[in-house]
């Protein structure tokens, strides 16, 4: 099932050209407090001991985007920015109901609309009633000013959405836009299966699973884990 939530507890500097760091984008948006530790973290650290690092007690929610219009047509989608289908919207609502009582402080999504919209729709079901807002991460000063929330009170009811290409779906290269069944007929089922499921073999002009995993892991270790360590509850809305 798409847009389902997987709950887990505890536990790169951004390389996007023209993008500021997540910390800087938080400050620019008027959300400085997200760069601090969560309210319960200090007490947890004081109680920690031994060789193991203390747990932050933070939640991590992993969510796959709802069905896209190309999923519905059995097309290779990859990094093409295809919207959700009607079914995908309903799946996002259903996923939101499943995590309605799980605390969420910050959301990470890919740069693709289907992952962002899934997260935004899901959060409309959340018990907190907080508003998910996409952060502007560019360097244009006018755009930074225009996108800033100037009310500190309102800012504390915002759940920031951080977009990054490092969480994008695997790039399928020259397969993108083609029907999966038709590609199997023209290139052979074994070859297409290898392109899709081999860890090291990439489709023509695309990414292997190994390449995809490297960029995702680097982003998680350098950006997501520090948020969890600060005690912030994180949701990632991305791809399978």
Residue ranges: model-predicted function:
Residues 1-10, 16-19, 24:
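N-terminal mitochondrial targeting presequence
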Residues 4, 10-11, 37, 42, ...:
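Phosphate-coordination/substrate-recognition cap region in phosphate-metabolizing enzymes
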Residues 57-65:
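Short, hydrophobic/glycine-enriched beta-strand segments
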Residues 75-83, 178-180, 209:
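Short glycine-enriched, charge-decorated loop/helix-capping segments at active-site entrances
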Residues 78-96:
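Short catalytic helix/loop segments, enriched in acidic residues and glycine
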Residues 85, 89, 112, 184, ...:
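Amphipathic, non-transmembrane alpha-helical scaffold segments
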Residues 191-211:
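Short glycine/proline- and acidic residue-enriched helix-loop micro-motifs
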Residues 211-240:
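GST-like fold's C-terminal all-alpha helical module
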């Amino acid at each position: 099932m798409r847009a389902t939530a997987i709950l887990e507890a505890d536990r790169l500097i951004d390389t996007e050209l023209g993008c500021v760091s997540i910390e800087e984008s938080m400050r620019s948006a008027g959300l400085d407090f997200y760069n601090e530790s969560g309210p319960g973290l200090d007490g947890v650290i004081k109680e920690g001991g031994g060789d193991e690092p203390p747990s932050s007690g933070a939640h991590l929610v992993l969510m796959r985007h709802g069905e896209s219009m190309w999923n519905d047509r059995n097309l290779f989608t990859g990094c093409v920015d295809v919207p959700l289908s009607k079914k995908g919207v309903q799946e996002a609502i259903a996923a939101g109901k499943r995590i309605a009582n799980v605390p969420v402080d910050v959301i990470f999504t890919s740069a693709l609309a289907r992952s962002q919209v899934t997260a935004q729709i899901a959060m409309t079901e959340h018990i907190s009633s907080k508003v998910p807002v996409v952060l502007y991460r560019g360097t244009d000063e006018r755009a930074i000013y225009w996108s800033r929330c100037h009310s500190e009170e309102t800012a504390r009811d915002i759940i920031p959405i951080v977009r990054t290409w490092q969480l994008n779906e695997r790039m399928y290269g020259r397969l993108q836009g083609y029907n999966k069944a038709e590609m199997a007929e023209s290139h052979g089922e074994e070859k297409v299966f290898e392109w899709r499921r081999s860890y090291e073999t990439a489709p023509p002009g695309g990414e292997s699973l190994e390449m995809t995993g490297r960029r995702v892991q680097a982003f998680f270790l350098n950006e997501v884990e520090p948020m969890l360590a600060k005690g912030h509850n994180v949701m990632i809305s991305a791809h399978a």
